[in-house]
């Protein structure tokens, strides 16, 4: 069975969206394999998670945002879970996310010099899922 990794980001936790996101996962028929609340995430872990972005000029605000508050991390499984979860999340940019997706319904567009607050993260490939699951768990 295919697995993927997800994060409910600090904005999702702060805004009380954990239950809504988990409900959507369960309603889709996916199995929640692992779930862990992290009250604080280190900069080192975020740097490892976003290793391809470290060094980019836009990265420091992402690191600051991802370490700004608690997150919920998890592993879900099911048929075509990576592709389906990414569809359920919606486009990264809130203004491009369709209504009915998590980001379309709940994400907030970023103002100038602000980080997009798009509620959730999901692995973009099987390789990324394996790497992220091993990193966080």
Swiss-Prot record:
It is found in: Cytoplasm. SMART domains: NDK. One of its GO terms (biological process) is CTP biosynthetic process. Its cofactor is Mg(2+). The keyword Lyase does not apply. GO terms for molecular function: ATP binding; metal ion binding; nucleoside diphosphate kinase activity. It holds the Pfam family NDK. Keywords: ATP-binding, Cytoplasm, Kinase, Magnesium, Metal-binding, Nucleotide metabolism, Nucleotide-binding, Phosphoprotein, Transferase. It comes from the Bacteria. InterPro entries: NDK-like_dom (IPR034907), NDK-like_dom_sf (IPR036850), Nucleoside_diP_kinase (IPR001564), Nucleoside_diP_kinase_AS (IPR023005). Its EC number is 2.7.4.6. It catalyses: a 2'-deoxyribonucleoside 5'-diphosphate + ATP = a 2'-deoxyribonucleoside 5'-triphosphate + ADP; a ribonucleoside 5'-diphosphate + ATP = a ribonucleoside 5'-triphosphate + ADP. HAMAP family: NDP_kinase. Belongs to the NDK family. Homotetramer. NCBIfam families: PRK00668.1 (NF001908). Major role in the synthesis of nucleoside triphosphates other than ATP. The ATP gamma phosphate is transferred to the NDP beta phosphate via a ping-pong mechanism, using a phosphorylated active-site intermediate. This is Nucleoside diphosphate kinase. It comes from Streptococcus pneumoniae (strain P1031). The gene is ndk.
